A protein has these predicted regions:
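Acidic, low-complexity Ser/Thr/Gly/Pro-rich repeat segments typical of extracellular/periplasmic
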Residues: 2-129
């Protein structure tokens, strides 16, 4: 057990969009949102944190941009990390976003465990190219 400083609580994953287990997610989805209970976008931790998130289609890792809204720009968004696939999502495919344990809050607390969000896209109204 890691000794905590008085007043410090561990970093927790709160929610995602799309949610874990979602099906019928639009293949036109441009950005997934990951929400935590602490500031994970501060400059002091951002270089590390943007490397702690990966995304796969099935067993194939896909290229993503991991982005934020700086806490100095909009403090209310300090708990959100955004994941943007560089190429569009395929219809009727399973995706997973993995958040690694070394994700760190501004106060130094780490996530401490791997979090996986899985979702499946639905049909595209226009055929995939």
């Amino acid at each position: 057990m890691i000794a905590q400083q008085p007043g410090q609580k561990p970093l927790n994953f709160v929610s995602s969009y799309p949610r874990n287990g979602a099906t019928g997610v639009s293949p036109d989805l441009k950005t997934a949102r990951l929400v935590f209970d602490k500031n994970v976008v501060n400059d002091a931790v951002w270089t590390n944190n943007r490397q702690q998130i990966k995304m796969w289609r099935g067993t194939t890792q896909i290229s993503i941009n991991v982005t934020r809204i700086k806490d100095t720009v909009d403090f209310s968004k300090r708990n959100n990390i955004y994941v943007k696939p560089k190429k569009g999502l395929r219809s009727l495919s399973w995706y997973k976003i993995v958040i690694y344990p070394n994700l760190t809050a501004k106060n130094g607390e780490k996530l401490g465990k791997t979090v996986t969000i899985r979702f499946k896209t639905g049909r595209r109204s226009q055929p995939d190219e």
